[in-house]
């Protein structure tokens, strides 16, 4: 299997995805990172590896809720989801998605013909932020996405 990753984009997801035939191999080849929930050692390794990727010019897609939504309600953000970007001091581009829950309404199969609305927010530059400002980034991003979700509804 040949994988072309022209835009150098990977994602951070649950280790479950690595076990899916074809998808797991493809995702690993484009440098996706897999988290094992409850495994601190794995989380630290992923943070260090992710920071390396970001410093090498890769972009990583992270879903800060840590899971898919089964409704239009936004879940709680995981505190660690911002550690990669704030540690690497790279820009964060918040993206609001609305309607993805329709894809899994029966929670078994992906439904075809569904629409997902996407709103890309302005980047948040972290390079010159103080520790205090970095600590406030998760709340700022969550507020932006929550506001974006209201716009898209």
Which residues make up each language-model segment?
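Non-catalytic C-terminal accessory region of glycerolipid acyltransferases
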Residues: 44-153
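Catalytic core of membrane glycerolipid acyltransferases/transacylases, capturing the structured
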Residues: 1-40
């Amino acid at each position: 299997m040949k994988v072309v990753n022209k835009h150098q984009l990977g994602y951070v997801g649950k280790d479950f995805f690595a076990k899916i035939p074809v998808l797991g191999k493809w995702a690993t080849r484009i440098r996706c990172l897999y988290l094992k929930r409850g495994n601190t050692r794995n989380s630290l390794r992923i943070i260090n590896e992710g920071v390396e990727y970001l410093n090498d010019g890769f972009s990583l897609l992270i879903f800060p809720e840590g899971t898919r939504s089964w409704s239009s309600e936004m879940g709680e953000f995981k505190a660690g989801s911002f550690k990669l970007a704030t540690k690497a001091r790279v820009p964060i581009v918040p993206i609001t998605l609305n309607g993805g829950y329709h894809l899994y309404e029966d929670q078994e199969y992906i439904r075809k013909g569904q629409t997902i609305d996407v709103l890309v927010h302005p980047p948040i530059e972290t390079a010159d932020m103080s520790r205090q400002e970095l600590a406030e980034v998760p709340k700022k991003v969550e507020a932006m996405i929550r506001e974006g979700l209201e716009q898209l509804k």
